[in-house]
């Protein structure tokens, strides 16, 4: 499961935390660290990455909680980004011209 999420651009820690949030619902960073065994500093860094990538939501409160985005939304967001990148590359990368090998004529005395 983690490897499949990594194909969508998540790090191993982000994927682990995404699964934790998805299975348990909204959690604080402390609770995520406790449930996953990942250090709190790494958890908060990974949670920020998940929010930035659209894989989780930050629920602002006295104690901030995080909620995993629905799988469908995660997949749609990543597919949309890939399609945008594909369109950009197709429109902006010039085709490579095939180089023809030249020939040399040697003239001289035998």
Task: Set out the residue ranges of the language-model regions.
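Short amphipathic alpha-helical interface segments
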Residues: 15-26
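A short acidic, leucine-rich amphipathic alpha-helix
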Residues: 31-36
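Residues in the helix-turn-helix
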Residues: 42
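Alpha-helical DNA-recognition elements
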Residues: 45-53
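Short, flexible active-site-proximal loops enriched in glycine and acidic residues
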Residues: 53-62, 91-99
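Amphipathic alpha-helical dimerization/coiled-coil segments
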Residues: 73-110
């Amino acid at each position: 499961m983690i490897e499949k999420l990594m194909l969508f651009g998540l790090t191993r820690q982000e994927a682990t935390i995404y699964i934790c949030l998805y299975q348990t619902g909204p959690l604080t960073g402390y609770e995520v660290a406790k449930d996953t065994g990942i250090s709190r500093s790494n958890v908060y860094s990974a949670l920020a990455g998940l929010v930035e990538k659209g894989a989780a939501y930050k629920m602002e409160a006295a104690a901030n909680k995080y909620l995993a985005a629905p799988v469908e939304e995660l997949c749609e967001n990543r597919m949309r980004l890939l399609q945008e990148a594909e369109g950009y590359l197709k429109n902006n990368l010039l085709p490579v011209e095939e180089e023809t090998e030249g020939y040399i004529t040697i003239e001289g005395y035998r």
